Every structure is written in structure tokens, then in C-alpha cells.
């Protein structure tokens, strides 16, 4: 079958590993169902993909379909200091994206591969505006939990009380969810957050929430059934995760080119079952020097084998490079390994891994649950603090090590060591493992043939196919003409438009 006959879906991603990889996982799943996927994101991230060496411009076969990449310039030099201001960058990306995306769609139509649907992730809600202007359906992939989706929804619409400057420590009671303490709700919603620009970025999606015909969630029904049932009455949500776990499509993720992917696995192969603690704080969390030292001494004192991912901060990020305690590597010898990157999915699936010290980002949370690995929670901010509460108190697969950045303290080596020992041996470790294995089984059943997530993704595929037939059978010349009109219209955007976008993003809603 030629690729021209396949339904073509355009994935538009905000740049960054935590944004691109979940959308890429969704893309390979849709490709396995017989779709042709194009993933587009700014060239600034495309350079990282090419550097990693796991990239090709040619369509890659996945199941019955294909996936390919197409990058676009965002209009700023790579070292432009304005990139550090998220409000400014999002406005610039919207200004350029509204010109570029219609051109990509126009080019596809002229090549007899018309786009039938657009899917975006958070931070770029304007993609649904582009789709609507062209008469195309759109969907959104939400890459946090349904619980966090509900929290942001209720905050945006003012449906329940949240902490305020006058009452900063009130608890939050959301329908069909456990009570959230003030430091357990997504921290960007707290009035004292040092990251108000991230609150604006996330809530921007809720302004356009009525435009996508479907909101896909990287979770599974059995994990969050009460809040999913509740929110499904309000929004067209479909849980389709865990996306990384789907057996129908091979793993395809973007990594940093820091090491050979098999290096960690070769080391783990030499360790006994359930003997290694895996430590990783994701791609955006960087700990203070003192905290790194306390974790290091805790590992030395515990005598537990470990694999520790310590990613260096990006150049010019302003984040200080941290050092391990003096003589640390010599003292641990072969009992420990420190790396800059790891193939996390493979690591968590390895039988030698006993538990996972994690920052509780949603990708890592889903990977731990679906791999059956207990966790020690070390959240910092955002949805991480909410995920940590769920892991410890609801899913019961985790031990809480800290409550987040707002706690404003260094976790001592004694506290860390105590958690490490409890999570790897004794009655608590047994209970955590039993619960973790239960969720692993539930996750596998969700993505298996006929499972809850499999049924939802099939329903989504069927709907896109149905609307695709309507689009193709309508006047193709009319469709191309509509795209051409939009391209010409957006090409007239000026620098003043960008200023208006930045100001409107900051002021149109008092988040």
C-alpha cells in the first residue's frame, strides 16, 4: 500500500524531551493502526535529535503505517536571550507557527497526502485555531494525570476554592479526588509559585479546550477511574496510556547523546534480582550541591547498589554543575554506577532494579507503575507534588522522601538512607512491590487487545478515519484554496502582532 492512501495526521509539539517523547509515543501507536504521521517541532529541537543520531527524514515504518519528522525555524537565533522568557517564546512560536503549519498542510495537500487531523500537546493551544480555520478536526494530548487535568480545569473556571494570598494554606477538595493539602496540588497554581509563567502556559490550553474534538490522556482508566468518569461528563477525554507500554509499536523516543544506550543494561545484567536502586530526577530538575552530597553519603552508608543518572545542566542555563562527595566513586566501586543518561524504560523493566528514586514527573510515574517498580518520591514542583501524593497515598507504591521545593529544606542523609532501606527490604518493601506489580498487570491489560486504552485509541482512530473520508470527498481544490488563503493572511503578521500576543498572554486572564 502506498503511503499516499494512508490517513495523514499532523503532530505539532512544543520543543523539549518531556513534550516530544509522549507525542512521539502516541504517533507510533497511531502509525501501528495504519496512519501516516508527521511530527513537527522547531528546528532548535530538531538539531538535538540529529545530534543523538536516532533520526531520519525518511518515513519510518511502524506496524501498518509510517512516521516522519519535519522541522521549522522559529525565527530566533539559537542563542537569542529571549528564549529564556517563556511568555515571549510562546508568543513567538504562536506567531511563526500560525504561518508555518498551514504551509506544511498546503504542501501535504499538493503532494496528494492531505492532512486529516492535527494533534498538539500543551503550551501550543493555537494549533486548534489553525485546524478550525482550515475546517480540520484537532485533538490534544495531555501529558499529566487526569487528576492534574481536573485540578487545572477547576482552577481555571473558579469552581472550587484554591490557596490564595489571603489563605495560602487551605486544602483543596475536588470532586471524586482525595483531599489535596496546599502543598499537594499542582504547585504552579499556588500564589507563591516562582513559576507563574508555567501556570499561564498550562492554563492557556483551557482557553481553547472547546475546540479539540478529543483530549487524549496518557493514563489508563483503571488507575484513575473515579476522576476519569467525572471529567468525561465535562470534556471529551479518552485515556489511552500508558503510551510507552503499548505492545503494538516499537519504542521510539528522543534521547540525549550522552552514552551508549546498552551501557547501563550491561552493568545491570551483572547484578542480582531486586538489588539495585535506580535514581533519576528527569530532564529539568537539578538538585543543589548540598542535597547531592546527602544522597551520596546515604548511598555509601546504606551499602545498596545503585544506578544514578546525573545529567549536566545545559550550557548558559545558570544552573551550577554539582559534584559528588570526595572519593565517592572510588568508595562505591562496582556497587554503584553514575551516568549522564539512561534508557529509562529498559532500566525499569530490568529484573535487578528494586526501586526508583524519582522526581515524580508524569512520564516517570507512568513508567514506574507500568513496570511494577516501587518508588521513593522526591518531587520538586508542578504536577510532581500531586503525583507523589497519589503514588504514596492512593496507588500505594511509594515512600515519601520530601514534599517538594516549597518545603525549602535539605533532606538529610539519615532520612534518605532510612527510605532506601525500607523500600528495598522488609515488610514495607514487600507491600510496595505487591501493589506495584498489581498496577503493572492493570497497565498491561489496558493496552492489550480489547483493553480499556486499546478500545479508546481504536475509537479515536475510527473517528479520524470517518472525518478523513468527509474531508477527502469534499472539494480538494476548495480545501487547498482555504489553506492558501490562510497562508497569505498569516504571512502579513508584523512585529506588532508579536507584542500583542505577549501582552495578551500575560494579561487576558488573571491566572
Swiss-Prot record:
Keywords: Glycosyltransferase, Transferase. SUPFAM superfamilies: UDP-Glycosyltransferase/glycogen phosphorylase. Its EC number is 2.4.1.210. The keyword Iron-sulfur does not apply. An anthocyanidin binds at residues 19, 382. It comes from the Eukaryota. It catalyses: limonin + UDP-alpha-D-glucose + H2O = limonin 17-beta-D-glucoside + UDP + 2 H(+). Gene3D superfamilies: Glycogen Phosphorylase B. UDP-alpha-D-glucose binds at residues 344, 359, 362-364, 367, 383-384. Belongs to the UDP-glycosyltransferase family. PANTHER family: GLUCOSYL/GLUCURONOSYL TRANSFERASES, UDP-GLYCOSYLTRANSFERASE 84A1. This is Limonoid UDP-glucosyltransferase. It comes from Citrus unshiu (Satsuma mandarin).
Amino acid at each position: 500500500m502506498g503511503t499516499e492512501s494512508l490517513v495523514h495526521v499532523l503532530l505539532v509539539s512544543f520543543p523539549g524531551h518531556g513534550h516530544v517523547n509522549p507525542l512521539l509515543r502516541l504517533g507510533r501507536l497511531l502509525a501501528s493502526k495504519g496512519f501516516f504521521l508527521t511530527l513537527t517541532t522547531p528546528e532548535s529541537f530538531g538539531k538535538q535529535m540529529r545530534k543523538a543520531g536516532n533520526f531520519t527524514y525518511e518515513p519510518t515504518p511502524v506496524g501498518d503505517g509510517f512516521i516522519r519528522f519535519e522541522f521549522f525555524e522559529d525565527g530566533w537565533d539559537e542563542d537569542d536571550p529571549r528564549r529564556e522568557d517563556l511568555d515571549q517564546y510562546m508568543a513567538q512560536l504562536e506567531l511563526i507557527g500560525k504561518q508555518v503549519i498551514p504551509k506544511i498542510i498546503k504542501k501535504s495537500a499538493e503532494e496528494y497526502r492531505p492532512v486529516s487531523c492535527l494533534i498538539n500537546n500543551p503550551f501550543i493551544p493555537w494549533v486548534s485555531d489553525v485546524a478550525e480555520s482550515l475546517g480540520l478536526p484537532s485533538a490534544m494530548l495531555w501529558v499529566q494525570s487526569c487528576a492534574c487535568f481536573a485540578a487545572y480545569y477547576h482552577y481555571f473556571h473558579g469552581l472550587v476554592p484554591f490557596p490564595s494570598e489571603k489563605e495560602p494554606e487551605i486544602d483543596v477538595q475536588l470532586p471524586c479526588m482525595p483531599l489535596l493539602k496546599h502543598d499537594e496540588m499542582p504547585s504552579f497554581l499556588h500564589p507563591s509559585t516562582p513559576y507563574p509563567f508555567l501556570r499561564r502556559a498550562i492554563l492557556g490550553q483551557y482557553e481553547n479546550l472547546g475546540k479539540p474534538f478529543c483530549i487524549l490522556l496518557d493514563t489508563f482508566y483503571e488507575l484513575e477511574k473515579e476522576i476519569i468518569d467525572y471529567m468525561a461528563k465535562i470534556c471529551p477525554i479518552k485515556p489511552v496510556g500508558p503510551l510507552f507500554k503499548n505492545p503494538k509499536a516499537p519504542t521510539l523516543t528522543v534521547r540525549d547523546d550522552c552514552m551508549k544506550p546498552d551501557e547501563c543494561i550491561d552493568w545491570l545484567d551483572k547484578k542480582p534480582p531486586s538489588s539495585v536502586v535506580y535514581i533519576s530526577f528527569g530532564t529539568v530538575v537539578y538538585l543543589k550541591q548540598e542535597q547531592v552530597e546527602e544522597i551520596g553519603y546515604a548511598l555509601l552508608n546504606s551499602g545498596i547498589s545503585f544506578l544514578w543518572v546525573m545529567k549536566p545542566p545545559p550550557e548558559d542555563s545558570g544552573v551550577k554543575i554539582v559534584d559528588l562527595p570526595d572519593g565517592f566513586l572510588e568508595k562505591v566501586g562496582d556497587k554503584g554506577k553514575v551516568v549522564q543518561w539512561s534508557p529509562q524504560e529498559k532500566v525499569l523493566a530490568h529484573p535487578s532494579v528494586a526501586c526508583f528514586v524519582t522526581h515524580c514527573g508524569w512520564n516517570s510515574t507512568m513508567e514506574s507503575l507500568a513496570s511494577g517498580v516501587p518508588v521513593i518520591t522526591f518531587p520538586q514542583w508542578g504536577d510532581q507534588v500531586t503525583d507523589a501524593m497519589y503514588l504514596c497515598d492512593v496507588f500505594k507504591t511509594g515512600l515519601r522522601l520530601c514534599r517538594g521545593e516549597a518545603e525549602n529544606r535539605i533532606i538529610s542523609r539519615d532520612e534518605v538512607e532510612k527510605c532506601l532501606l525500607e523500600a528495598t527490604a522488609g515488610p514495607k518493601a514487600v507491600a510496595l512491590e505487591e501493589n506495584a506489580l498489581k498496577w503493572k498487570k492493570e497497565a498491561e491489560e489496558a493496552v492489550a487487545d480489547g483493553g480499556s486504552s486499546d478500545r479508546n485509541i481504536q475509537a479515536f482512530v475510527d473517528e479520524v478515519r470517518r472525518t478523513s473520508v468527509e474531508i477527502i470527498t469534499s472539494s480538494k481544490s476548495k480545501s487547498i484554496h482555504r489553506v492558501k488563503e490562510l497562508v497569505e493572511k498569516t504571512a502579513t503578521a508584523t512585529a506588532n502582532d508579536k507584542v500583542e500576543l505577549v501582552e495578551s498572554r500575560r494579561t487576558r486572564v488573571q491566572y
